[in-house]
Amino acid sequence: MEIRAPPTSLRLAPPPPASASFRRTALRTSFLNGSVSLRLIQVRQSNVNRFKCNGIRSNLLDRFSRVVKSYANAVLSSFEDPEKILDQAVLEMNDDLTKMRQATAQVLASQKRLENKYKAAEQASDDWYRRAQLALQKGDEDLAREALKRRKSYADNASSLKAQLDQQKGVVENLVSNTRVLESKIAEAKQKKDTLKARAQSAKTSTKVSEMLGNVNTSGALSAFEKMEEKVMAMESQAEALGQLATDDLEGKFALLETSSVDDDLAQMKKEISGSSSKGELPPGRTAVSNSGAARPFRDIEIENELNELRKKANEY
């Protein structure tokens, strides 16, 4: 007997074949004398998802380490001082030069010992050769043979020492050449260091000046200058107006003086006219002065004729 799920029960969607595998197994129970069997579905996760998870995890770790390194480099770069870095670089180069000189001295000492050993071996070889000659002259061939064996041993040792000595000389020449190159580089680095330090100091000064200028409130300063300019212009206008008023006052006073002078002249002329003869001849076109002394305006004949004609026309209308 099998128990099947009703049609309305939930169903699992079939997973992709690349990510998981399914296997159905029958499970027997003691319920109803073991006649009931259940079918279980076992899900096995394939290695594909596991590999994908590992790849994503490693990618995230790489990105995180890259970000941390970038921030660390940025922090270190912000703390780097060009002057101190240059001084430290020169000190390290001097330390390397000292170590190279010490190594050269040690190699030279070893070369000197090899030379002494080589000379001693050659000297011993020559001595045993002379002894072999002496023994042969005395008729002792066995002794001469032993002397030649000793001589050969020292000669072989001298040859070996000669090869080592030649090799040591090459090492010494290489060390001396590298030492001279390093010395020249250090001298050049010191010159560049002074130049770069001066440029770095100039750049720092320029940066500080730029920061100071950037912190200055130029808008407030310009507005203050504009206000002071307006104030100065107002003061100049006020001074100009006061000067103009003072000039007008002086001109008015002089005009009054000139007017009084004209009045005086006119009065003087009236006195002269009144004191003269009342029936004297006047200039043509003017009437005589009355006996009362009141002056009447002079009349022009042409004007009087035109005036009479106008009066006639007015009366006709």
Curated annotation (Swiss-Prot):
Residue ranges of coiled coil: 92-246
Keywords (A to Z) from UniProt: Chloroplast, Coiled coil, Host-virus interaction, Membrane, Plastid, Plastid inner membrane, Thylakoid, Transit peptide
Alphabetical list of InterPro entries matching this protein: PspA_VIPP1
Disulfide-bond pairs as recorded: none
GO annotations of cellular component type: chloroplast inner membrane; chloroplast thylakoid membrane
One Pfam assignment: PspA_IM30
Membrane association type: Peripheral membrane protein
Subcellular location: Plastid, Chloroplast inner membrane; Plastid, Chloroplast thylakoid membrane
Keyword Chloroplast: yes
The keyword tRNA processing appears for this protein: no
Comp. bias regions, Basic and acidic residues: 297-317
Region (Disordered): 265-317
GO-annotated biological processes: thylakoid membrane organization; vesicle organization
Family affiliation: Belongs to the PspA/Vipp/IM30 family.
Purpose: Required for plastid vesicle formation and thylakoid membrane biogenesis, but not for functional assembly of thylakoid protein complexes.
Subunit structure, interactors included: Homomultimer. Complex formation involves interaction via the central alpha-helical domain (71-286).
Name of this protein: Membrane-associated protein VIPP1, chloroplastic
The organism of origin for this protein: Oryza sativa subsp. japonica
Lineage: Eukaryota, Viridiplantae, Streptophyta, Embryophyta, Tracheophyta
Gene name in the database record: VIPP1
